[in-house]
């Protein structure tokens, strides 16, 4: 769910897994969304979402599917950096592979264990559990069938694990993407699993039992997944985005699926065709109590001439973000907003290749009752450094992420590695903002922002932790964590857990 510092109680939402030149002036990073005298009252802190050891701190977790394990290239692993009073850091780190005692399977070349990761409370205890996709896993003679593993959190970090999904045939690549939520309303967490040309669900992750949600030609690409209550029935729904290319036509889709208790399955209840998105995220950006859907780097990908599926065409330059607002009585999507870096009040300038919205994350940073949106632009140029990358923190308000005049709300700011208080230097190819996520890593009740730069240091990668989504904090890299050398670039942070 979007992480809230303090907010009213609302329907639970789960965050999913989920990913070339412009000039951006250096931006100071004071707390972007300072609370005002009119801020909403603050009843309680949000529950921790990725506290695997139950110590009161959310933990940072990163899939490294290109990692070498026991000499096996791209066998893959997951790096868990435990939170603490000063945030995540090398003080407590766990590297999880298929050679780890608790984990089923064996490291093999090309397994890509850690290809997707998500946190979920599968077994109903106080510890978050780690769900891991391995889309390259071979199952018996079935090549690249893929698998999903649930590793259970304990007071000592992790204990037992079980397989929650196995691909049924070669090329299924189960675990290409993941989302977790209680879709059925039975209080138990369910999993949505992206594979090749299909999405399946497991309504009992304690066993490897999957059921189809949808199947379509996706050209081998991983579907983008997130969750939110878009039909206002009190249950989380599944949002998925994908596009086909020359199979036989090029077309793109956003689809919503909700639980149909009469049929005992997920049912499609809303579609938008020909508007592709590189990222999806849900949140209540206008504070009306209904979940909204953000489509990152939304643009038309279609052979047909469809009018503006992502809003005004000029706002797709450099990457546009399109918001479909929730509402009562089946009115989801009727109200919309679209913006890019050329929108008034937005830091930066929209240029081709920016990738604005390639990564999204949601939290109510200032606890005013309106969710705020973080948008990564990994292709952003900083000065002459192409693809150095940036992130923009967009403040939610009564009208959503724009004010009545159509400008970005006051307090919207940009972050990049040349900004005061941000560690490091913006360099070509860093891809800062390639992935973003929230977690309360220092336990103060305020969402902390994680920003990945998978191209940092010749694609070794790194993750920045910004406490309270402001300047300062720390950086973790493969070198600082003591991760082993790999035959392939690690691109640490490209698969950033939520």
Task: Go through each PLM region and give its residues.
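Short glycine/acidic-enriched loop and turn motifs that connect beta-strands
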Residues: 66-71, 136-141, 198-199, 243-248, ...
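Beta-propeller blade termini
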Residues: 43-58, 63, 114-127, 175-183, ...
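Extracellular low-complexity, Gly/Ser/Thr-rich intrinsically disordered linkers
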Residues: 355-362, 368-373, 393, 429-468, ...
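Hydrophobic strand positions within the blades of repeat-based beta-sheet folds
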Residues: 60-62, 78-81, 96, 113, ...
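A detector of repeated loop/turn-to-beta-strand junctions in beta-rich toroidal repeat architectures
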Residues: 73-77, 90, 129, 142-147, ...
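Acidic/hydrophobic-patterned starts of short beta strands in beta-sheet-rich repeat architectures
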Residues: 54-63, 124-135, 185-194, 232-241, ...
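Mobile, glycine-rich extracellular loop/lid and propeptide segments
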Residues: 57, 61, 109-123, 127-137, ...
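Blade-edge motifs of beta-propeller repeat domains
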Residues: 2-6, 11-48, 82-112, 149-173, ...
